[in-house]
Amino acid sequence: MPRQIPLEKVRNIGIMAHIDAGKTTTTERILYYTGRVHRLGEVHDGAATMDWMEQEKERGITITSAATTCFWQPRYGLLKDVRHRVNIIDTPGHVDFTVEVERSLRVLDGAVAVFCAVGGVEPQSETVWRQANKYKVPRIGYVNKMDRVGADFFNVVEMIKERLKANPVPIQIPIGQGEMFAGFIDLIRMKGIIYDKEDGTTYQEVEIPHDLENQAKTWRVNMLEAVSDIDDSLLEKYLNGEEITEEEVRRTLRVATLKTEIIPVLCGSSFKNKGVQFMLDAVVEYLPSPIDVGAVTGHSPRDEDEKIARQPDDSAPFAGLAFKITSDPYVGKLTFFRVYSGVLKSGSYVLNSITGKKERIGRLLQMHANHREDLDEVFAGDIAAAVGLKDTKTGDTLCDESKSIVLEKMVFPEPVIQIAIEPKTKADSDKLGMSLAKLAEEDPTFKVSMNEDTNQTLIAGMGELHLEIIVDRLKREFKVDANVGKPQVSYKETIRKKVEAEGKFVRQSGGKGQFGLVNIIVEPSEKDKGFEFVNEIKGGSIPKEYIPAVSQGIQEAMRNGIVAGYPMIDVKVTLFDGKYHEVDSSEMAFKIAGSIGFKEGARKAGAVLLEPIMAVEVITPEEYMGDVMGDLSGRRGHIEGMHQRAGAQVIKAKVPLSAMFGYSTELRSMTQGRANYSMEFHDYSEVPASIANEIVEKSSGKVTA
């Protein structure tokens, strides 16, 4: 079946924001107005379509980014009445699920940033914004919850400018705020939109109310100045006092949004059904199609320096990126992927250029939150799910075997918190390992390991909520009952100096012996670079078939560092010389030699202990400022700044995670429940010597590592 919708009429977008800004409700309304859902789902009664995991329905938060497809014809503007296809990914706002946001932003072309009209720019908004900046994702802003008491559209616009360092340009301003919110003024057409009923499908176009005429003129001038700054010919017209047409405004707004120079800002109340259709018009009008985004670049699987580009074109060779794996009770493993170029047919074979394996596409599915529709083929720009890919992981490239390419991989943060987990019964014991492996396959920030000293299974993740949800899923989806220990900090180790080391493994005791000798340089790598292995063997002092074994031995040794047995990170090892024996050398011998050499090098290189540091933001009434700051300092916190927000004081600090367990209870009692806080992982930093000694002592008899 040929392509149904031309590529320039496709929009791949994400709905992004902090927790409670109304993302899921906004997505629900989009699905309702585009005809994909016949009944409105409300988050607060647990019926939202996009929140389809049991835990999401109970907690009213979105955990996994569900992908869905819908169609929209704008009512106004240059694309009036032209049918567009909109693929939407609903992303979670809770900081423990940042990886889901990161994953979805990687495969999107544009995004709607939803802000709460009362709370404005919250800490998580800043995190998500930084992630979107990293991938240069064009955005429009949507100030939601305009019907709430305390709603202030203009304050939110100011916060977007100040805190996100963006260039917000309102293209609408509200008519009334809070309970008086009735609609908005369209600054491009200079018309008022007043909603009649609660269902939002009925509204009247009116002249601008008298009392808002001056305000509307002021903000229209602001918009015209912003677009004139982008286009010299418009600037000339503007300075000469000539009329700038509606078409020119819309066209320039689109160009500026695509370059991320402007963020068009709209307003509404998704819950009260006001403003969503006009936001959809803006999605189609200002956010990019895959053609606007242009070619995706990657490199040859054989040579990282050989760059390859793939145009968003059905006639180009197939290239796609797997961005999410989920387990489905009916079809098994589902691999969500974005098609960047070419066409993929159901039943065909693709090459996974990361593993080098060919895989067969059993079925292709178009997902609508949690129900699905079978497809015969998918085209450039599509987001779909495949059944049948056994060895594909998140971030892998799928491509045409004859024209292979490796797209940029996704980098995921290291887990910061871990707990010991043990099955309650023998039956649970049999299922636990398999169930955890499935969950780890779905979520790259969830890690499972074994403490060899105590024989305990350890699970690690991005926060307490993250691990709570995992344990909950074990019980519900996999029917595994487990006991969990207290949360433990995931410490890491690294080195501070550059040293040379030798690793020698010799075993000669009759018959075939074992021999391997390696000379390596061990040094710190750049922060967040992970492990780097450089092979500089010249002249065959170690045969090339043994080199991967050396790297493997080093990586295995890094799993248990030498300070307190914690994993080592940010280390670079260069293999520059060695010796082998014609008869006695083997892969195993060189693997052990690599491990011995690395351990010796790490000892000489001044190995140190690292701990996760959290960026903490506390919002408190002024009278508790002193107590809160004193308490944070007592937790080894470093206060970085304070400012006012909506009548409260905001304190920003960097605090070790180990000092933050149980903080919410302490904060409640200190402020009589009037303060709240949020925190997210910032980085790993060296543990002070006195505390490091305590940790080492504990770990020498440790129960959980």
Swiss-Prot record:
It comes from Chloroherpeton thalassium (strain ATCC 35110 / GB-78). One of its GO terms (biological process) is ribosome disassembly. Disulfide bonds: none annotated. Keywords: Cytoplasm, Elongation factor, GTP-binding, Nucleotide-binding, Protein biosynthesis. Gene3D superfamilies: 3.30.230.10, 3.30.70.240, Elongation Factor G (Translational Gtpase), domain 3, P-loop containing nucleotide triphosphate hydrolases, Translation factors. Residues 8-291 form the tr-type G domain. Belongs to the TRAFAC class translation factor GTPase superfamily. Classic translation factor GTPase family. EF-G/EF-2 subfamily. CDD domains: EF-G (cd01886), EFG_III (cd16262), EFG_mtEFG1_IV (cd01434), EFG_mtEFG_C (cd03713), EFG_mtEFG_II (cd04088). This is Elongation factor G. It comes from the Bacteria. It is found in: Cytoplasm. The keyword Cytoplasm applies. The keyword DNA repair does not apply. It holds the Pfam family GTP_EFTU. PANTHER family: RIBOSOME-RELEASING FACTOR 2, MITOCHONDRIAL, TRANSLATION ELONGATION FACTOR G-RELATED. One of its GO terms (cellular component) is cytoplasm. GTP binds at residues 17-24, 90-94, 144-147. Catalyzes the GTP-dependent ribosomal translocation step during translation elongation. During this step, the ribosome changes from the pre-translocational (PRE) to the post-translocational (POST) state as the newly formed A-site-bound peptidyl-tRNA and P-site-bound deacylated tRNA move to the P and E sites, respectively. Catalyzes the coordinated movement of the two tRNA molecules, the mRNA and conformational changes in the ribosome. GO terms for molecular function: GTP binding; GTPase activity; translation elongation factor activity.
